[in-house]
Amino acid sequence: MDAIVYFAKGFMYLFEVGGNTFVSWVTGIIPKVLLLLVFMNSIIAFIGQDKVDRFAKFASRNVILAYGVLPFLSAFMLGNPMALSMGKFLPERMKPSYYASASYHCHTNSGIFPHINVGEIFIYLGIANGITTLGLDPTALGLRYLLVGLVMNFFAGWVTDFTTKIVMRQQGIELSNQLKAN
């Protein structure tokens, strides 16, 4: 009987933890994402949709801008997860590659810019703690992480371009390379 009671308590505790997690999302990440979305759309309305579309069209002409500069700026300005939403301004064919690059930027830039991905800063701080224990400055680690990330995140987007083309060929589909006006 004790085993059944123990199992029942554990089972109910699972839902208690799930409820607490849900409440933390409702009071934490969900309002933040909602307000960031409102903020981003307000900036777009203030700047003008046509100017944002022109910048996206300009960025989509060059893979370095599309998978290097735009994801970095989006991660820096909007943080995770809103940086991923900037891909909506690119042509359909570039969206998978932008997502690959931008999602990596939300990780590799957090050593120097912790506001990008606050939820992951404990990983960097754990590594930086080891560097500090050795008597070294963790800033150099953060800069190296950022610089390597700039290069590797660009390549992640670029390689995803090639894999997207392979998948399109396999599936017999064609994603548009033209920017649609929003």
Swiss-Prot record:
Residues 1-182 form the PTS EIIC type-5 domain. GO terms for biological process: phosphoenolpyruvate-dependent sugar phosphotransferase system. It is found in: Cell membrane. Keywords: Cell membrane, Membrane, Phosphotransferase system, Sugar transport, Transmembrane, Transmembrane helix, Transport. It is a multi-pass membrane protein. The chain crosses the membrane at residues 28-48, 63-83, 139-159. The keyword Cytoplasm does not apply. Induction: Activated by sorbitol and repressed by glucose. Signal peptide: none annotated. InterPro entries: PTS_IID_sorb. Pfam families: EII-GUT. GO terms for cellular component: plasma membrane. The keyword Membrane applies. PROSITE patterns: PTS_EIIC_TYPE_5 (PS51107). The phosphoenolpyruvate-dependent sugar phosphotransferase system (PTS), a major carbohydrate active transport system, catalyzes the phosphorylation of incoming sugar substrates concomitant with their translocation across the cell membrane. The enzyme II complex composed of SrlA, SrlB and SrlE is involved in glucitol/sorbitol transport. PANTHER family: PTS SYSTEM GLUCITOL/SORBITOL-SPECIFIC EIIC COMPONENT, PTS SYSTEM GLUCITOL_SORBITOL-SPECIFIC EIIC COMPONENT. The EIIC domain forms the PTS system translocation channel and contains the specific substrate-binding site. This is PTS system glucitol/sorbitol-specific EIIC component. It comes from Clostridium beijerinckii (strain ATCC 51743 / NCIMB 8052) (Clostridium acetobutylicum).
